[in-house]
Each structure stands twice: as C-alpha cells, then as structure tokens.
Design a protein with these regions (language model features):
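Active-site-flanking beta-strand signature of metal-NTP-handling nucleotidyl enzymes
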Residues: 2-8
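Short hydrophobic/aromatic patches at helix-to-coil boundaries
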Residues: 94-99
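An amphipathic, aromatic/His-enriched active-site/gating alpha helix that lines ligand/cofactor pockets
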Residues: 20-38, 56-93
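Short acidic/glycine-enriched loop/turn segments that link adjacent beta-strands
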Residues: 45-49
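Short, solvent-exposed loop/turn elements at beta->coil junctions and helix N-caps
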Residues: 39-44
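Short, surface-exposed ligand-recognition loops at beta-strand->loop->(often short) alpha-helix junctions
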Residues: 9-20
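Short hydrophobic/aromatic beta-strand micro-patches
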Residues: 9, 54-56
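Structural preference for beta-strand elements that scaffold enzyme active sites
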Residues: 5, 50-52
C-alpha cells in the first residue's frame, strides 16, 4: 500500500474556502468513477493554513491509472482552477506503508 500526501500552503485566511473546494473536487472524482481512499487534513499546530489531501492506494500503478481520469474531467479542471488561486505553494510526499 502507498500513502500519497499532497501538501498545500494556502493564502492567509483561505482554509475554509479551500476545504469546501476540495470536498467538491472529491465529489467530482466520484462522479467520474474514480474511487480512492482519501482524507482532507488541516493544520492544528505548525505551519498555518496548511491543507493536505491524503490518498491511500494499493500501488503506484493504481494512482497513475486514475490521475488521467480525474485531471481530464472538465468539472474537476474548473474546480482545481478555483482551488489553485488559493494556494501559495505545495509539494507531494509518497510513502510505502510498512505496517
């Protein structure tokens, strides 16, 4: 199993708006037929205005197979364009689950 964490540093005060857009994005993914185990995480302590989309997938192939389906969806693209306007920076972490 693989855990993918997409970590976004948001613009000041934009967490609630970003979470709402991410929830909408996940709904769009499901309508497109892409079901992934996902969680939305927000900061409690540490760097302010951090949002994480965490995915758990069986392997990298499963992630690679689903990404074109999601990113090719016009509704998802429109949603992500709104979301990206709220982001200062971001990065991705990919981990193998050992236990």
């Amino acid at each position: 199993m693989i855990v993918v964490r997409n970590v976004f540093r948001l613009k000041f005060g934009k967490s609630k708006e970003a979470v709402a857009l991410f929830k909408e994005g996940i709904a769009i993914q499901k309508r497109a037929g892409v079901e992934m185990n996902q969680r939305i995480l927000t900061d409690i302590v540490g760097t302010f205005y951090t949002l994480v989309l965490e995915l758990t997938v069986p392997n990298m192939g499963a992630l690679e197979a689903n990404m074109p389906k999601v990113m090719g969806d016009k509704d998802w693209q429109a949603n992500y364009q709104k979301f990206s306007a709220l982001v200062e920076s971001g990065y991705r972490e990919i981990f193998m689950i050992v236990e």
